[in-house]
Design a protein with these regions (language model features):
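Macromolecular interaction modules
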Residues: 1-99
């Protein structure tokens, strides 16, 4: 299983509350349209440093190839465009999960 974590920092003109509403109500439905997506979890920051991330998404795919293929589709391009329309920065991490 392949896992990526995406950290978004909201635009300065968006409150944390407005950013969270956008992510859950508008962005999450777009992400769920990604082909091959196995699981998607959104973690919104309620308390933390202002210079840190405002939200973290965890995405699981069967493989790196499936992840790359999903983001190469029109749905994937729409997800990235929507993210960047609401965030001042976006960082993506490929991670190995250990329990």
């Amino acid at each position: 299983m392949f896992k990526a974590i995406v950290m978004l920092n909201r635009r300065e003109d968006l409150s944390r509350e407005a950013f969270g509403r956008w992510w859950l109500d508008e962005h999450r439905p777009l992400v769920r349209q990604l082909p091959g997506l196995r699981r998607y979890v959104v973690n919104l920051v309620e308390e933390g440093p202002e210079e840190g991330g405002d939200g973290f998404a965890e995405l699981w795919f069967e493989s790196r190839e499936a992840f790359d293929a999903a983001y190469a589709t029109d749905a994937g391009k729409a997800v990235v465009a929507d993210s960047m329309a609401h965030a001042r920065s976006r960082l993506r991490y490929v991670v190995a999960e250990h329990e």
